[in-house]
Structures are given as C-alpha cells and as structure tokens.
C-alpha cells in the first residue's frame, strides 16, 4: 500500500496545494497554528486498512517525525480513520499540509490540518446511539447528526458474520456542547426509516447516584468480610452452574479457575442494590469480570451495545485510585439478547485479558 500511496502523491500533488476539504467528517483542526501547535497535525479520512507503518511512511516522506499515531478502536483494534503526526520542524508540518491535504487514497480524500490543543470544551463529546434502522449507512447517520455540529468520528457496529448493521453507532463531536444539542434534538426521535425512537446518550455517562451507592456498598462489604478457601471454591462452582444455565453447555475447569476468588467474594453482598438479575422491571443484569484498571463505562457500552438494548453500565472503581477494580455490570432489557451477549463475550480477549461474563442472580450473591 505504501507504493500506491507514494504513487498517488506523485500524480496528485505536482500541481500545488490540494483542493478544498470535505464539508463533513472528523475535522478536529485549525487553519492556522498557535505557537504551541506548529508541528502537530491531525489527519482525517484515512483508509481503514491503512497500517501504522504506512501512515508513518507517508508523512515521513515530508520530513523528520518526532512521533505519529494511527488511532485505533480499543475493542477491535481497527483504525478509526484518523491519526496524529508531530514533526521536528514547523516548516515540515506546513509542507505536509500543503502537500498531502486533499490527497486521494483508495476511496478516501484525506484532510491534513494543525491539531488543536485539548481543552475542556472538546472532551467527553462521544455519543452512543441505539435503535438505528438496520438499513442506515454511516454516511446517513453522519448527515442526521451533522446538523448539530462538526463530527470528528462516526461508526456503525456491524454483525461480524453477516456484515449487517446492528442498529448501534457512535458519534464523536468536535465539542461537548454540540453533543449535548444532538441529545436534546434526537434522543427519543424517530429518524426516517426507523420503527422505534432512537436512544442518544453520552457513551460514558452512567447514573452517578447509583454508582456512588454501589461503590459504598461494595467498599463496606469487602472491608468487613473474609471467607476461606472452601467458601471461594463453592462460589466458583456456583458461577460455573450459572454459566452452564446461560449457555446450555458444561464449562471447562480452566474457565472456573480463571475467576478471582477475591472479586467473587466481594460480590456476594451486592444483591438488593438495583442490580439483581431476572426481569424484575429493570432488565437482565450481567456480571463482567477481568476488566483492566483503565477500563471505563464506554468499554462496556461498546462491548454489549451490538447485542441489543443496554439500559445501564457500571464499572466498579477503587476509592483511592479511581481505577477499575476489575469488574462491572451491564443491564440489558431483553433476555435473549443478554444471553447472546454472554455466550459471545465470555472468554473474549480484550487486550491482554480474557473476560468472564455471566448473568448476575440473587443466588449467586448470597453470603
């Protein structure tokens, strides 16, 4: 692909600066640079199959690079279609904009501009969208949301087997206020072709009140309880039985051994704090174990959103560090969708960790 890229450059940039940028899409950049950002560029509309090495080779042909990063989805590892390049010399950064902005690569026309320094106004602007018509394309979703502001990235989740939309997507706006306006304007509305209203919410915006109650209960429970090895082993087999019920198959002993005795023991006092399994008017609650310390609610949204309607996600955090304690909860409205999520995600490798996923039931958490 590098040869194709360089060939495209030779055929396109000989006549001078590229043409105008596309009107919509991930345009997090400025036309002029500030003193602090004369060397740092953002590159949008990259082909999804472009690799880190190809990205570096393309921009390294302009001048010496201090760093470059092709941004990838944390879950799938796939390129999100944009990246950052930091040059050693401001002149090279300026040359890269004049040379590569508007370059056509495969079906994409890339956009190269100065990266804007981060600020509070542009953070936390990522939206989770569910209930989209299965026929809606990514471009149509962008058109629906672009009336509220500048879109940085967008994505519709597809079924890996069929390639058909799961009706779930993510939209990242340039500014948080734009995301807020999109929620006000589109949440609960029926776009063209939709049978039901869509849900639009922040991808990492769970109920804070419920979260604090959960954290307090878990902290107090873990501080006052201790159980011996026999109790831990019993809890493991309880979980194994639950997994058998969920999948209809017998779990291997290696699966049981991967559960953390400490985490499972700490879970035993959580019944009755709004996360009990079963219908119970609140949906079906799923226990997710072996999350990394850096995991947040957006990870759970992205993992479970493709399988059906998710009403709530919760990552349990350490009081001192605010890091994930290794587990969390997801509530889904439909049993079949919840069971499918469990069957698909239990044993799923997320980074260097293998997730353990099961239904949470009142029996599971008896002392």
Curated annotation (Swiss-Prot):
Tissue specificity note: Brain specific. Expressed in the hippocampus with expression in CA1, CA3 and dentate gyrus.
GO molecular function: mRNA 3'-UTR AU-rich region binding
Keywords: Developmental protein, Differentiation, Neurogenesis, Repeat, RNA-binding
Top-level taxon of the source organism: Eukaryota
Classification via SUPFAM superfamilies: RNA-binding domain, RBD
Gene3D superfamilies per record: 3.30.70.330
Entry-linked NCBIfam families: ELAV_HUD_SF
Subunit structure: Interacts with MAP1B light chain LC1.
Stated family: Belongs to the RRM elav family.
Domain note: RRM 1 and RRM 2 bind cooperatively to AU-rich sequences in target mRNAs. RRM 3 binds to poly-A mRNA sequences.
Designated name of the protein: ELAV-like protein 3
Record organism: Mus musculus (Mouse)
